[in-house]
């Protein structure tokens, strides 16, 4: 269905490089606005729960899109899908930039950005899977991972500098740089043949509605949205169990290691993403620092450390096993959260230091989750299973950002609930951090129990 010019095999790696650039900007687009959330809240005079939708909106369509593009690649050639993705990403950037003074136009632009950018990470996996032998796929995925990690690391730094010295609205047009890749992709990538596979549009719509309802619930805690989420989610589950080509394979639900990886990964990714989105608010409230300082001095060291921890985590998994590395990663995250919670007013640099270990722990758990999920799938299930893992990861991050934004807006936790010696202005952050640490520990304990009971299935 899709191929590169056979006579010029060397061009494949050039194509891979350009696709990595696209993935870089998709991740950059996720991280770059994070440090500016407090400034955006001041600009629109909105609560964190509402403001965080600037990132949540992007992650919402981005997560759904990653799964949809993977399905579409089965019967629409990748060249067309990539061009559509780039075009939508640039269109969304333009809409958001022009309408940045109008909140709902800004959100709409971010939704369109997410739809377009979702094409890049999902389709690059398809390109590698179809054009590189299994023996060489490790190097390709390693290269992709490094580029993505670089985007995660540079995002806060670039965002802080541009927002501080120019204006946060200019961050919205950064993805438009990807338009320069279109002529190259048109020249090198040739169209393939489409198949007669059908796409489960009803399943996509039902799942999307249920996700939107849940995220709206986390923003203002209106129980109507939770009821609607439950209704649409139940309908979605019944739907995928009846159709012949479901959007999500219901048989995967019976795979214990796969579901454990999905649950544990989703919870941890959600919590850490929420923490990252909370840091700029915390730094602004307690230390009154500008966005450039937040991006370069607080967040940047931690996000860049992921590259080192990722390599070290892979080494430890081979030597000590998946469970050991997962426990180590979970402890690193939870201890870091508790340290910041107890000493949140001590020094900004303590947060910087502990942020490194939060991201290190996240890198360890990501390595383990990927191995658990991939090793639990048969050859026929790999494509749909890994696609579902990517979807869950991105969706969890968006959900975490929405939940933390909603919690920061709640008056109930804006008081000294846990640590009496913390000032009221810092109490909300300490409360959330302690709750996050407890959830991470409970997740770790659950993983250990399930892992021990089903140890043979994890081998």
Swiss-Prot record:
An example molecular function term from Gene Ontology annotations: antiporter activity
InterPro entries in the record: MFS, MFS_dom, MFS_trans_sf
Gene Ontology biological process terms in this record: proton transmembrane transport; response to antibiotic
Main subcellular localisation: membrane
Chain ranges passing through the membrane: 12-34, 49-68, 81-100, 105-127, 140-162, 166-188, 201-218, 223-240, 261-283, 293-315, 322-344, 348-370, 391-413, 428-450
GO cellular component, one term: plasma membrane
Similarity-based family: Belongs to the major facilitator superfamily. TCR/Tet family.
Function: Resistance to tetracycline by an active tetracycline efflux. This is an energy-dependent process that decreases the accumulation of the antibiotic in whole cells. This protein functions as a metal-tetracycline/H(+) antiporter.
Protein's UniProt name: Tetracycline resistance protein
Source organism per UniProt: Staphylococcus aureus
Gene: tet
């Amino acid at each position: 269905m899709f191929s590169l010019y056979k006579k010029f095999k060397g061009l494949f790696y050039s194509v891979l490089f350009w696709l990595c650039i696209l993935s870089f900007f998709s991740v950059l687009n996720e991280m770059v606005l994070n440090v500016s959330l407090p400034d955006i809240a001041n600009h629109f005079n909105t609560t964190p729960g509402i403001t965080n939708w600037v990132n949540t909106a992007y992650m919402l369509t981005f997560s759904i899109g990653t799964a949809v593009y993977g399905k579409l690649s089965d019967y629409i050639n990748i060249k067309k899908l990539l061009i559509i993705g780039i075009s939508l990403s640039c269109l969304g950037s333009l809409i958001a930039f022009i309408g940045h003074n109008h909140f709902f136009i800004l959100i709409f632009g971010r939704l369109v950005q997410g739809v377009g950018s979702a094409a890049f990470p999902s389709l690059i996996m398809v390109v590698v899977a179809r054009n590189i032998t299994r023996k060489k796929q490790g190097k390709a995925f390693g290269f992709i991972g490094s580029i993505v990690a670089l985007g995660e690391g540079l995002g806060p730094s670039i965002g802080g500098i541009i927002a501080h010295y120019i204006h946060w609205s200019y961050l919205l047009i950064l993805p438009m740089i990807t338009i320069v890749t279109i002529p190259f992709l048109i020249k090198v990538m040739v169209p393939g043949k489409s198949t007669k596979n059908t796409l489960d549009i009803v399943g996509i719509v039902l799942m999307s509605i249920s996700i939107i309802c849940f995220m709206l619930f986390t923003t203002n805690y209106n129980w109507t949205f939770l009821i609607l989420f439950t209704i649409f989610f139940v309908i979605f589950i019944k739907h995928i169990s009846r159709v012949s080509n479901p959007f999500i394979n219901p048989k995967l639900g019976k795979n214990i290691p796969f579901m454990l990886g999905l649950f544990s990964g989703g919870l941890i990714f959600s919590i850490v993403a929420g923490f990252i989105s909370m840091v700029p608010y915390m730094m602004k409230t307690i230390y009154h620092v500008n966005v450039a300082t937040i991006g370069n001095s607080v967040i940047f060291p931690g996000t860049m450390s992921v590259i080192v921890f990722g390599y070290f985590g892979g080494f430890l998994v081979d030597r000590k096993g998946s469970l050991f590395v997962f426990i180590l990663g979970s402890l690193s995250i939870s201890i870091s959260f508790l340290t910041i919670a107890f000493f949140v007013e001590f020094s900004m640099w303590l947060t910087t230091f502990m942020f490194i270990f939060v991201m290190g722990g996240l890198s360890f758990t990501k390595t383990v989750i990927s191995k658990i999920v991939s090793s639990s799938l048969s050859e026929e299930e790999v494509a749909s299973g890994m696609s579902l893992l990517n979807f869950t990861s991105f969706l969890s991050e968006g959900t975490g950002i929405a939940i933390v934004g909603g919690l920061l807006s709640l008056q109930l936790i804006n008081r000294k609930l846990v640590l009496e010696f913390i000032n009221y202005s810092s109490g909300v952050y300490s409360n959330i951090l302690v709750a996050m640490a407890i959830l991470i520990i409970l997740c770790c304990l659950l993983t250990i129990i399930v892992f021990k009971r089903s140890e043979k299935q994890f081998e």
